């Protein structure tokens, strides 16, 4: 006897909160996975992490944002981008900010 197989095993979620939560998990978890992987690289490597101006506090600037501007997070997407910036900076300071490190990371 064949069992009817559910082709869509995941419950469909159409609310915006679920979508934002999924995007945020992907952004943050991918950043953590990349940074953790870099800790095990044994050759000279340069990494440029490109984020978005959405990570900064929105103050309706007419000029472009600078990396010294205040991080934001007033909506879920902005919060996840700001979280990624914080993660990258903490990994740089904790693991890659010494003369012996073969890994060089910058954000733009």
Name each region found by the language model.
Residues 21-33, 43-46, 55-108:
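Catalytic helix-loop patch of NAD(P)-dependent Rossmann-fold dehydrogenases
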Residues 17, 40-43:
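Active-site phosphate-binding strand-loop segment of PLP-dependent enzymes
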Residues 52:
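Residue(s) in the substrate-gating loop at a strand-loop-helix junction
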Residues 1-25:
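NAD(P)H-binding glycine-rich loop region in Rossmannoid oxidoreductase-like domains
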């Amino acid at each position: 006897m064949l069992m009817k197989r559910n082709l869509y095993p995941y419950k469909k979620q159409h609310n915006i909160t679920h979508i934002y939560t999924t995007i945020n998990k992907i952004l943050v978890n991918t950043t953590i996975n990349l940074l953790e992987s870099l800790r095990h690289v044994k050759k000279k490597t340069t990494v440029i992490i490109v984020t978005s101006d959405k990570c900064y506090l929105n103050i309706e600037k007419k000029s472009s944002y600078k990396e010294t501007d205040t991080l934001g997070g007033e909506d879920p997407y902005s919060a996840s981008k700001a979280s990624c910036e914080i993660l990258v900076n903490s990994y740089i300071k904790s693991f890659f900010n010494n003369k012996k490190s073969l890994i060089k990371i910058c954000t733009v």
